[in-house]
């Protein structure tokens, strides 16, 4: 069964909007919730993620693409998102699972 691309985009963005302040989820976790793969979720975020809290979606290791790190850091500090010494998000403490 083929999925409507607009519905897929809306579903991804809806999940991103549910991530609580101070927490993050991963591209893969969103993909597990909506179907598809992490790269598809990344493509949606790249094209349509501006209006949602995009900084709450990170790689599975807690890192962001280098081009987003500087923009995300103020949000993490404001929201009290747990960070590791490396600057990546502490996924043990900050991960939010959209399937729970």
Where are these regions (language model features)?
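Nucleic acid-binding interface residues in structured DNA/RNA-binding domains
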Residues: 1-100
């Amino acid at each position: 069964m083929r999925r409507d691309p607009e519905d897929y985009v809306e579903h991804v963005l809806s999940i991103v909007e549910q991530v609580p302040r101070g927490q993050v989820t991963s591209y893969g976790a969103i993909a597990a919730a909506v179907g598809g793969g992490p790269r598809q979720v990344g493509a949606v975020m790249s094209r349509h993620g501006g209006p949602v809290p995009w900084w709450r979606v990170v790689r599975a290791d807690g890192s962001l693409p280098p081009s987003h790190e500087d923009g995300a850091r103020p949000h993490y500090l404001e929201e009290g998102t747990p960070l590791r010494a490396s600057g990546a998000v502490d996924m043990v403490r900050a991960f939010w699972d959209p399937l729970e």
